[in-house]
Amino acid sequence: MAQYTVDSFIVELGFSEKVVKGLQRVEKMSMQAAQRIERNINKAFDVKPNKSSQEALNRIVKNAQSASGRINKALNSSFNLDSQGVKSLKKLETQAKKTAKGINKSLKDAMKVDGKITIKTGRGRGGQSIPPVGGGAPRGQRVDVAQRQMERMFNNNFYSGLTRRLETIGGQGNQMAASFRGSLQNIYNRYKGTGKVGEYEMEVKKLIDVTKRWVIAENARLKSVKESAWLQDRANASLRQLVGGFVSAYALLELSQKTIEAGVKRQSAQLASTAIFGADTQQARMFAASFAHQIGQNYTDTMKQYSNFAAGAQPTLGFQGTQEFYKNAAMFARIRGATDEDLKGIMVAFQQMASKGKIQAEELRGQLGDRLAGAVQLFADAIGKTPQELDKLMKDGKLLAQDVLPKVSERMAELVKQAGGMNAVSKQTATSMGQAKAMWDNTLVALFNNSSEGISQLSNSVAMFLQGSMGSTQALGLVIGNLLKGAGNLLDFVTDFMYRTSALYYYARAWYKDLDNSQQKLIKSAGEFLGTVVTIGGAVAVVSKSVKLLSGLVGGGIFGKILQRLGVSAAGTAAAGEAAAAAGGVTATRMALGTVGSALMLRGSTDPNAAKNYSEVTLPKPFENAVANITNPKRPMFFDENGQLQFAQYTQDVEGNRKLIDNGLSNWEIIMEKLSTSIDNFANKFNQTPMMMTPSGLPMQTKQTLNVTFNLDGKQIATKMVDITDKNQEDILLSSSYPEEE
């Protein structure tokens, strides 16, 4: 790429040699045109700020435009260019026009107040000054003009878009912006008053280039951080959506439950009010609705309390008296700071007083006094007695409800009025909160009223279903009962079986210990003793009739302990055990493929891990590792535009460094590898597979299949099917002529 200087800008072109020569001619012609323009301008004349000066300026602009046109014409006539060349030359033309405009602007800026104009001299290639027409020294640039140019450049760069971009990056960006402005200020101070605009501009460009490179690098880093954060957030999107789905479903269930509860309570309160107030039901409901809103209580609770209180107090106080008493008592309780629960207890105490007909210390000092401070003094002031006199009246049974309660109602009304009345009650925070709760309860009741028909139909359908399935339920109960009976019989049978096994074991031990050392040494290698031991095995099989039980006992090491304590090694006893079993009167059996043959039985009995393989029932979560690997934020996943699950190609270590993931496995292979390992471990430990017996007496293993489906974000991402086989405990069928007990 050749570089050619044209005036004060650099153009990089990749043309052929012919194009380069043409550009050289263009450069020469441009310089000649510029020199002609400068010679015309540098003529010594005075320009007045009038019509003639404007005409002179117009001529300058016209000459510059004419020069630009000649440049374009010379280029087009010198050679033919392709589209790229035309674009480059158009750019060159644009720069020439820009130069002409700059000349015009410089002329306007250089005009003095008295109309004098000082023109800047041009510079040729290599920085050589072009002498003005008429001789004399070259004219230098005025310092004040250069200073104004530097000031404009300084202000533009100081508040440029670059500094604003730096300030949006963050803490480091703000520091970089401050550093940039400080460096810019230092450069300006260094060149201030020197008139070296070109050098100043180059220094500023260097500073801007360095700052821009930092901005580009920082933007790349921030983009990487955002992408990593997005991928990590997307990796756990399925779990959050799953939890969110459960929360939404639970919230909907809770809303349905609360709706039904609120609706049923409202229906119950309405029904009770009808039964208690009779013809005055509508008036009572209107009072309850209005008063509940005033004191910030739920309408259902107010209606229920009012109805219950009226049931006991209405015969004594009448409808109007009951309403006034309830109103005064509720407002008085609110002023004394009673909560909704306290208000319920207070009204229950007043109800009991009214229904019993007498005021007793149990209600006044206990139930009412615990919830309403100053209750005793309230009653004493109402009837004009002292607390001691009040106690005596209650003790004598002379404090009647029909005489006392109306006076208490009047006293409570006086105290409420002194405290500010209903206005004071409505301004309490508890009242506002209660009103909000009441509106929510009304909303739930509205939901219930619109859905009550559907709820009733569903409830009836459920009841009919349960009634219709009663026979099936009874049959299921019989099945469960039979299973439990079988389990009980099995435990009883196992107990008897253990007694028999223990007897055979101790019999063999006692018989062996009665022998002397030489006889014991002979017996160790004899098939007779082995036959006795295997006879025990045959007896066990005949008695138990349970293959799993025999396998468990073998795994538990009962026969292994017999051989170990008798000093008989398990190695090399397979064939001897089979022969000894036949010699001992035990028919050799066909063993199922697996670990429970006659020889493998002995070997498994001496294996310390045999019992563990059989008896381990505390299995780990079989898919915990697979799920943890899939949802690991170190291994983020996402769905591509085709809806396929993909792994991110990069991960992040504990230090925050990005690493490329490339282990040679595809995404599905990684999932299946982890999933298969977990499922295989689960299948290996799930070794108690049920067996079926054919009519010929041979064991036939039933197949069990474990189907596992993984869903992520509502999409099925993997399906795994595993056949669970019993690799450790296979059923055996032993046939033995075990003598029955006499």
Curated annotation (Swiss-Prot):
Q: InterPro entries, alphabetically?
A: Tape_meas_N (IPR013491)
Annotated region Disordered: the residues are 120-140
Q: Which Pfam families match?
A: TMP_3
**Superkingdom in the source lineage:** Viruses
Q: Does the keyword Coiled coil apply?
A: yes
Q: Which of UniProt's keywords are assigned here?
A: Coiled coil, Viral release from host cell, Viral tail assembly
Q: Which GO terms describe its biological process?
A: viral tail assembly
Q: Which family does it belong to?
A: Belongs to the Mulikevirus tape measure protein family.
User: According to its UniProt entry, what is the function of this protein?
Assistant: Serves as a base for tail tube protein polymerization and acts as a template for tail length determination.
- Protein name (Swiss-Prot/TrEMBL): Probable tape measure protein
